Structures are given as C-alpha cells and as structure tokens.
C-alpha cells in the first residue's frame, strides 16, 4: 500500500492554440486538428515568437530560448504537492524524477529538482516516457516499506515542445508542456492510497515512438494508437473484474490524454 499525501502540477503561461498552428502554414487548420486529435490548446516553455520565427529548426537554440528549466517546472509542481501534503522540503527523504525531455544526460533530473527545492536526500531517475508517473508509483509499491523514508517525492517535468519540429504538422499539433509531482509514503497513512499496480511493456515496438538523442520526436501514429487502445481496453477490463464489483458504481477511469479519438474509442 502506497499512500498519496499530496499532488501538484505546473504548466507554463504561453498557449499554443490551433489558430497559432494554422498561422504557421504547415498544412493544418483547427477543424483538421479537432477532428484528428481533439486538442484545442497546449502550453509551452518556449516563446511563441521563437516558434513562429524558427519553427524550432535548431534544437540547441530551443534550450537557450526556453523560459523555464526542467528543475524549475518540477519545483513549481513539487511545492504545490508539498503544500497540499502539509509538508516542507526538509521532510522529503527520497526524490525520484523522470522526463522524456531532459536537459542533461547526467546529472539526474531528480538531483537538479532537489537542488532547486533545497532538498538534501538521495535522488535518482526513473523514466518511462508517457508512463513515467505510473512506473515510479509501481516501483515504490514493490519496495520494502521499512526501507523507504517516511516521505518520498516523485516529479515528472515534461517540456517536450523543445523537441518538436514545428514544420511537421503530425507532431506539432500533439504536444504541450507540463510538470507533475506527488508526495507518497509507505508508512504514514493518508486518505488516498494506491492499492494495486501493474506494469507492462512491448519491447518489440521500441521503435514505434522515439525522441533520438539530438533529434526530434517521431512516431508511427497508427501503430501506436492501435496498440494504446488495445492495451488500455484490456487493462480497464482487468481492473473492472478485480475492483469494479461492490464499489457502488464509483469506478472511474483516467486515461492517457494524448488523443481524444483514442479515449473515445
């Protein structure tokens, strides 16, 4: 059992609307975007003028132009989680982070976030792309409770727009930036808890979605969506079978929000 004491989020102020993407003249418009992916707007750590003028042709320049560092966005989310938990940074005994858009291969994102927060504790990264939050929770849930500190902070700073080619409509319409954080405990009880978790991977499909080192995001959209729909459906049925009965109809599903079409299907 893993208790949830507080959860937090942060998203940057700059908004990429469908109208903004239409004005980039990359062969898309609002009707096409809403029909294909169902996204109305997304946030970015990049200045809108930078995207408008360069379409992010130089990935290195995108980090220099960025209005926030990953450590900063992680810290904003973490402070909200800590405040909701009624805790201070000094109460945290372990920090785990993960990001698909790290600024450095080393040091760990967790160490930089901890430094931003003034936390002096062990730090390491667990990154699993879209499933990073779930994998971090699953890992902690499988660890020996008496070996964990009273409170653990997990953070997920995802600022992927720095790795998007804004001349490519298939990827430009998808991504926004945001960071999340949670304060967890295996020993101190709270009103909410993770009762059960399971994880899975399809290693043979490793090349279907990727951000190569020094490159842009790319994916085989049809293959990825088909796989996601199939596996999400299987997971929902498994959860309903295990926990849906005798729950007074209070079962709720929160799915990965990459694509409205996938959720509706």
List the predicted regions and their residue ranges:
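Condensing-enzyme catalytic core mediating Claisen C-C bond formation in acyl metabolism
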Residues: 1-69, 168-230, 234-238, 242
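Buried hydrophobic positions in well-ordered alpha/beta secondary-structure cores of metabolic enzymes
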Residues: 4, 33, 81, 92-95, ...
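Acidic, glycine-rich active-site loops and adjacent beta-strand->loop/helix elements
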Residues: 10, 98-103, 128-132, 156-162, ...
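Short acidic, glycine/serine/threonine-rich loops at helix termini
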Residues: 16, 106-108, 137, 164-168
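Conserved catalytic cysteine-centered active-site region
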Residues: 37-45, 53-54, 99-151
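Phosphate/pyrophosphate-binding loops at sites that engage ATP/ADP/AMP, CoA/4′-phosphopantetheine
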Residues: 51, 77-93, 234-251
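Glycine-rich phosphate-binding loops at beta-strand->alpha-helix junctions
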Residues: 98-105, 252-265
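Flexible, glycine-rich active-site loops centered on histidine and acidic residues
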Residues: 145-178
């Amino acid at each position: 059992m893993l208790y949830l004491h507080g959860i937090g989020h942060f998203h940057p102020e700059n908004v990429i609307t469908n109208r903004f993407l239409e004005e980039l003249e990359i062969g898309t418009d609002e009707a096409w975007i809403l029909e294909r992916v169902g996204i109305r707007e997304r946030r970015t750590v990049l200045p809108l003028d930078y995207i408008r003028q360069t379409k992010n042709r130089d990935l290195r320049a995108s980090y220099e132009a960025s209005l926030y560092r990953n450590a900063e966005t992680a810290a904003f989310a973490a402070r909200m989680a800590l405040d909701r938990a009624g805790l201070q940074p000094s109460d945290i005994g372990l920090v785990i982070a993960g990001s698909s858009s790290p600024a450095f291969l080393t040091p760990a994102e967790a160490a930089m976030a901890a430094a931003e927060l003034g936390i002096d504790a062990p730090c390491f990264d667990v990154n699993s792309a879209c499933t990073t939050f779930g994998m971090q929770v699953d890992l902690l849930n499988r660890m020996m409770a008496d070996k964990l500190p009273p409170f653990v902070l997990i953070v997920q700073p995802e600022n992927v727009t720095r790795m998007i080619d804004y001349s490519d409509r298939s990827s430009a319409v998808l991504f926004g930036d945001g960071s999340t954080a949670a304060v967890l405990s295996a020993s101190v009880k709270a009103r909410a808890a993770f009762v059960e978790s399971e994880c899975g991977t399809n290693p043979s499909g490793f090349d279907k979605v990727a951000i190569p080192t020094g490159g842009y995001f790319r994916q085989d959209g049809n293959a990825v969506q088909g796989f996601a729909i199939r596996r999400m459906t299987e997971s929902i049925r498994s959860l309903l079978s295990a926990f849906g009965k005798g729950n007074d109809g209070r079962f709720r599903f929160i799915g990965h929000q990459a694509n409205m079409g996938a959720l509706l299907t």
